[in-house]
Amino acid sequence: MSNESKCPFSGHNSKPQVTVGGGTANLHWWPNQLRVDLLNQHSERSNPLGKDFNYRQEFKKLDYYALKADIKNVLTDSQDWWPADWGNYTGLFIRLAWHAAGTYRMGDGRGGAGRGQQRFAPLNSWPDNASLDKARRLLWPVKQKYGQKISWADLFILAGNIALESSGFRTFGFGAGREDVWEPDNDVNWGDEKEWLAHRNSEALAGSNLAATEMGLIYVNPEGPQASGDPRSAAPFIRATFGNMAMDDEEIVALIAGGHTLGKTHGAAPADHVQADPEGAPIEQMGFGWANSYGTGVGKDAITSGLEVIWSQTPTQWSNYFFENLFKYEWVQERSPAGAIQWVAADAEAIIPDPFDPSIKRKPTMLTTDLTLRFDPEFEKISRRFLNDPQAFANAFARAWFKLTHRDMGPKARYLGPEVPTEDLIWQDPLPAASATPSSASIADAKAKIVALGLPAGELVSLAWASASTFRGGDKRGGANGARIALSPQREWEVNKKAVETLTKIEELKASTQLSLADLIVLAGNVGVEQAAQAAGFNITVPFAPGRVDALQSQTDVESFQLLLGLADGFRNWKKQGVNTPAEVLLIDKAQQLTLTAPELTALIGGLRVLGTNWDGSQHGVFTQQVGVLSTDFFTNLLDMSNVWAPVDSTSEVFEGKDRKSGTVKFTATRNDLVFGSNSILRALAEVYAQADGKEKFVQDFVAAWTKVMNLDRFDLA
C-alpha cells in the first residue's frame, strides 16, 4: 500500500476528515440535556441586516400597489421549469400562504407565518409542503426587486391574498409587519415521531399544542385517518387540528371549502418517482427538492401529494362550485394515478377542465376530508347553508382566511399597510385608544402615592411581573398593556392570588392619578425594584415608558386568554399540578416565550428570588437573610460549597440545603433554583454575579432585563 493511500488527509477516504459541528454531539450522551441554547436563537450574529435595521420603517418606503401589481403578473407568467396549471399559479400561491400560516397553534403561540420559517428546515422539506419550493422561487424576482422593503414572511401571505383577489374574490384585508428571521425556530416542538407521516390519535391532539395529525402534515391526512378513506372518522381529527388553531366549525368549513375552490392537487404517478426533499437534495439542485423522474416531471406529470383532484369547473375563478358539486353528486372511491384514495362523481358528466389540454374534460373529484363536510352532521348543516347562500360563504371564508393568516401577529398595532381592516376582532386582543401621555409631574405624583402605600418591594415587583409575564413572543399575545390581570380569567388564576391582593391596593390609587391601571402596575413594580436596589446600596432609576391603556372585559376572550397561563412560571416558582415535565425545562420554555437570553434569565431569577416573589409566599430559592434587598445572595449561597442539597421526597421537586458540617437546614429550593448550580451553562452565568465584583453588574443587568419584560408588548415604542 502506498503512503498516499494510507494518509488520512489524502482525499481518498470515503468519510469526510473534518466536519465542523460534526462528531458525536452532547445530546447523544445526555439526551435530556437542558436546551439553554434555545435562548440564544436569532441573535444579531445570525442577522445580516444588523441591529439598526427597522422593518417597519423600511416597509413605509414601499410602493405597495406596485408590489401587488408585480405579484399579480407573476400569477400568469408561467415558467417552463414549473408550468402553471391553466396558465395560472393562483392555487399554488394560496397553498403557499395557507401552509406558511397553518403551522400556528394557539396553545403555546408558536408556529405560523410571522417569521418566514417556511424558508428553513424542517418546514421547507415537510412532505405536505412538497412543491412549495417552486412557489417561493417564483416569487424571488419580486423579492429581489423590492429588497428589504418587503419581508419573505409578508410576501408569502400577500401572494396568497393577491391570488384570491385575482380569482374575483374580495378578501377581508391584509396587514404587513411580519419580520424575517435567518435561521430555524428550534424551540417549536413538532412532535416526537421519528418518521414522516407517523399518525397521532385525535385525543392526543386535543390535549397538545400540535397542529397536525401526522408528522410533516399541516393539518390532516386528506385520505382520512391513516389513509382509511373514511370521511366520517376524519371529523374529530379535523376539529382537533383546526381547533388547536382557534378555529370553530364554521371557520373550518369555510377554510376547507374556500381553499379547495381554486387550483388542484398533483398525483400523476407513484411516489417512487420522487427524489429527495430540498434539505436532502444534491447541492446542484440549488435548494430545489422533490425532483420527479416521471415523464417531464412537471406540468401534467407533476407529483406533489399523490392525489389528482380538481374540485371546480372554474379552478382559477372564485365560485360556489365546491358546495354545488359536493351535494349534487354521488361520490365513489377511486385511486389516483399515484395510488392515493380519492373520490369521483360517478353520476357526473366530464365538466372539469384539464389544466394543460383544453380538449380534455374530467369528472369532478374530491378528497376524503372534503366529503367530511357533507357526511359529518354538524359540518353538513353549515355546508348546506353555504350552498344556499354563496355570499355568506364568501364572507365567512374572507374572515377565516384573514384570521388564519394573521392569528400569530398579535395586536392590530403591529399591522402595517393601506389594507388593514378598521374592524377590531376579538382574537386580536383589542385595546382602547390611548389618551394623552401622562406628564412627568403626574408620573412623579403617582410614584409618590405608590411609595406612600408602604408595601414591601417584593409585593410591588410580584404584581408587575404577574401582569407583564403573560407575554408570548410566538404570537405576541399577553403582556402588561391592557392590565388584563384585573380581568377574568387572569384575576382568578391561582398563581396570581397574592398579586391580586396587591392589585386591589393599586386599583384604589387609580382615581387619584392620571395614569392608567396598566401604567400604575408597571410603575409600582419599578418602584419596588428601585427600593430594593437602594437597599443594596445602588441609587438607580428604572426606565418607565407611559402610554399603556386598560382593556375592557368585553375586549377579552376568556377562553383564549386562559391559554396564556401556561404550565408553569418558574420565575415565581409556580407549576401547574399534574404536569410531569421537569420544572427547569418549563422555565426555559417560559424564558424563551419572554424572548430572554440566558444571561437575562439568570439575572431575573436571582433578583426575583431575593425580593421574595414566589407565588405562594414560600421560601424556596430565597437564599438570603435580607429579603427585599437586590443583592447577589441567591448566587453566592447557591454556589457555596458549605451547603449540601438533597430532595425532600421521591418526586425530587423540592430540596433542602443543609450545612455540610452541622446538618442544619439553611434553605429550601425547587428545580428552578438548583438548575443554576447544576447546569454547566447556567452555573457559568451565575458565577459572574456571585463574584466579588458582580454586585453592581447584577443590579444593572436585572434592571435592563426587568425593563425589557415590562415593555415586551409596547409595540408603539418600536
Curated annotation (Swiss-Prot):
State where the record puts the cross-link Tryptophyl-tyrosyl-methioninium (Tyr-Met) (with W-98). Answer: Y219-M245
Query: Quick check: keyword Chloroplast in the entry?
Result: no
Residue positions binding heme b: H260
Q: Which UniProt keywords apply?
A: Heme, Hydrogen peroxide, Iron, Metal-binding, Oxidoreductase, Peroxidase
Q: Which GO terms describe its biological process?
A: cellular response to hydrogen peroxide; hydrogen peroxide catabolic process
**Which sequence ranges form a coiled-coil region, renumbered to this chain?**
none
Q: Classify the source by domain of life.
A: Bacteria
- One Pfam match, given by its short name, reads peroxidase
Q: What does the entry's cofactor note say about binding and number?
A: Binds 1 heme b (iron(II)-protoporphyrin IX) group per dimer.
Q: Where is the active site?
A: H99
InterPro entries from the UniProt entry: Catalase_peroxidase, Haem_peroxidase, Haem_peroxidase_sf, Peroxidases_AS
Q: What is its EC number?
A: 1.11.1.21
Post-translation changes: Formation of the three residue Trp-Tyr-Met cross-link is important for the catalase, but not the peroxidase activity of the enzyme.
Reaction(s) catalyzed by this protein?
H2O2 + AH2 = A + 2 H2O; 2 H2O2 = O2 + 2 H2O
What cofactors does the UniProt entry give for this protein? heme b
Gene3D superfamilies, A to Z: 1.10.520.10, Peroxidase, domain 2 (1.10.420.10)
Question: Top enzyme class of this protein?
Answer: oxidoreductase
HAMAP family recorded for this chain? Catal_peroxid
What is its quaternary makeup? Homodimer or homotetramer.
Give the matching PANTHER family: CATALASE-PEROXIDASE, HYDROPEROXIDASE I, BIFUNCTIONAL CATALASE-PEROXIDASE
Designated name of the protein: Catalase-peroxidase
Look up and give the organism this protein is from. Answer: Acinetobacter baumannii (strain AYE)
Gene name of this polypeptide:
katG
